[in-house]
UniProtKB/Swiss-Prot annotation:
Part of the 30S ribosomal subunit. Contacts protein S4. Keywords: Ribonucleoprotein, Ribosomal protein, RNA-binding, rRNA-binding. GO terms for biological process: translation. InterPro entries: Ribosomal_Su5_D2-typ_SF (IPR020568), Ribosomal_uS5 (IPR000851), Ribosomal_uS5_arc (IPR047866), Ribosomal_uS5_C (IPR005324), Ribosomal_uS5_euk/arc (IPR005711), Ribosomal_uS5_N (IPR013810), Ribosomal_uS5_N_CS (IPR018192), Ribsml_uS5_D2-typ_fold_subgr (IPR014721). Belongs to the universal ribosomal protein uS5 family. This is Small ribosomal subunit protein uS5. The N-terminal domain interacts with the head of the 30S subunit; the C-terminal domain interacts with the body and contacts protein S4. The interaction surface between S4 and S5 is involved in control of translational fidelity.
Amino acid sequence: MAAPYQREQAAWIPKTRLGKMVAEGKITTMEEAFETGLPIKEYQIVDALLPDLVDEVLDISMVQRMTDSGRRVKFRTTVVVGNGNGYVGLAQGKGVQVGPAIRKAIENAKLNIIKVARGCGSWECGCGLTHTVPSQVEGRAGSLKVVLMPAPRGLGLAAGGPAKKVLEMAGYKDVWSRTEGETRTTINFALATYKALESTTTVRTRQKEEAQ
């Protein structure tokens, strides 16, 4: 079960323009932060604006590399963060120990946070609630393609492993999915799903422009 990210840290001293605006109380929501158009370069910005964010470790793998001084081992972790209500982030982290690698992945995932679009896009439903993707979207990572399609309320998440967890963290309840390619690599499966969700906002924006 995912748990809130808790870590002892020194008082945050923002270094970026957006960070200073958040610390001064000029920016109080993630939507306002995105509207500035400024990049999120400090994970503490997300901590401040999304205090209900939780994290889940999707994969931990050991990477070995031969050097002149001998064999060196590092751990590579894949983590997804989300608040179950429209925000999700995904990233990897590396370290000589598992703990620091996980913490780095969490921080990186927060820097990759996105707001996804939700709706009731299934012709089988029409309930008007925000429980599925608003339209069909797809994402690619390596040789893998993930296609997400609107599903009727009550179906659940018809997706496997990492994809299901990413969808849950983003706040989706019902989604059809289809994959093309190799799904055994956790990072590619999760990343392709994340990229598909990333395009939900693009699709929604384009539809609004066409309607005007």
